[in-house]
Amino acid sequence: MTFKRLALTISLFASASLGHAQSNELNIYSARHYQTDEALYADFTKASGIRINRVDSDDAGILARLKAEGTASAADVILLVDAARLWRGEHDGLFQGVQSTVLEQAIPVQLRSTPDASGKTAWFGFSTRARVIVYDKVRVRKEDVDTYEELGEPKNKGKVCIRSGSHPYNLSLFGAVTEHLGEQQAEQWLRGVVANLARPPKGGDTDQIRGVASGECAIAVTNSYYLARLMHSSKAEDKAVVDKVGVVFPNQSSWGTHVNIAGGAVARYAKNPTNAVKFLEYLASPEAQNHFANGNNEWPTAKGVAINNPALKAMTGGTFKSETVPVSQIGKNQIKVQQMLDRVGFK
């Protein structure tokens, strides 16, 4: 059952199917549509005895549903895949704050929400995905795409492929650039990116990588795990794509590469809040963190967790410098970013 197939008018009835409040249950609304997460849920149930009931949608659909359901919502845990949407859920009053020493010690402060006056935290990031630059190793020199700023420079005119500017992955990147450069300079940069497009924005991140390999463009912006999936693939056509492209983790000499998060929160009207916190604490454990790394090619957020994913290690040697700006601040920049996109004509 997915929200994409359900109208909001029947959401209250669908909520009932998730089960009533019981001490051995947990109801999750999840935007993580990854088959590999099934092992994550199974391991939690095996360790805790808590049965998981889950409904899948996208970030926007989940937030809309929570608003529509109000106090009748069955949701205990909310899992979203974008920092800006987590920020929006917090500021729309859809989450309840959590005090957990386990989570506070495990998750870096910049990858969770700012605590409220009572010291409670609304959401935590449990994995990161880097927004990287992929380039044609024949047509482009690596030193010409070492920074995000270079995406907007004249030397790269007609070379850039990127998905829609209003997609959450790009909104978060643009929000980060705005935080680092300031609004005026960020808008000038966006104008430069638009001027450098090889074609109008279309498709998903994998399409951008394939566009570089096919020669449609020479530079693309993508989340790191899309490239990692191609690197893990046994298909000849995917191997050919990987052979043709190089990857850059931008701004290693300045503020670091932008990372977005997948994170979780306890729903405001959770009927099983204790189980919800147990689940969030489980997501910060080494076992769960390695599920994210090995199952979906994401980087763990918990401190001190070692990973053993060949594709991630091949990209970076296992580590890279990421930005330290709080992801909650990036969410606050979303309105500014959308206005800038409208002004520069970035569709």
Stretches found by the model and what they are:
Residues Q22-R88, K347:
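Early extracytoplasmic/lumenal segment of secretory-pathway proteins
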Residues Y29-R32, Q96-Q105, S118-W123, Y135-K137, E143, E149, A236-H258, ...:
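Short beta-strand->loop
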Residues S73-I78, Q96-I133, E149, V160-I162:
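A structural signal for short loop-to-beta-strand junctions that line the ligand-binding cleft
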Residues L86-L94, D116-D146, F174-G175, V259-G264:
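Periplasmic solute-binding protein
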Residues G165, Y169-S172, A176-P250:
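Ligand-binding pocket segment of bilobal, Venus flytrap-like solute-binding proteins
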Residues A262-T324:
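Mature extracytoplasmic/periplasmic domains
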Residues N308-K347:
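Extracellular/periplasmic bilobal clamshell ligand-binding domains
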